[in-house]
Amino acid sequence: MNREQRRQAERIARRGARSTPQRESERNITHSLVAQALVRNRIMREVHSLRTNASLHAFTGNDASHIADRMGRLLYTVAYATTVHGLHRTPEANILRGTANALSDIAASPAALETQRAAILAGLSAIDRLMPSLHEFSLAAGALELDQILLAGNFTTDHVERMLQQRAAA
């Protein structure tokens, strides 16, 4: 590399290292309304996909472990957002607690699926009623916390009930 090429490379490196307010705002989604809208759209698309998957299996599925997994994921995410918004004392939050108990029963005994199906469907209805009151970023925070719990490898449906009880006691 000759001297001129080296100087040119140094100029390019310095130019790229400079941070302007415009470059910072382009990288930071909190200043970009378009980026925020895209993130919100993606979060809601994933939540609705999880909700659709859970409801299909709840209505027609016979695989108890799959129902418990999908519904448990959705339930925890919504329960987290519910507590963030202070809705943990609503009838819907009580239904979420009951659904968590039903999922716990299903996880322990897959034969209990048919007897607990009504509680799962009630939980889906409660989730539908809660969703308009929940912010997308609260749902995302719940999903991130769920991911941390899953990485630890000890997620049970009792996490939902404990979290709601914790917030109700506070």
What is each of the regions a protein language model found here?
Residues 2-6, 52, 60-67, 88, ...:
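Alpha-helix initiation/capping motif
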Residues 69-98, 129-146, 150:
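Extended intrinsically disordered, low-complexity coil regions enriched in Ser, Thr, Gly, Ala
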Residues 111-170:
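Amphipathic alpha-helical binding modules
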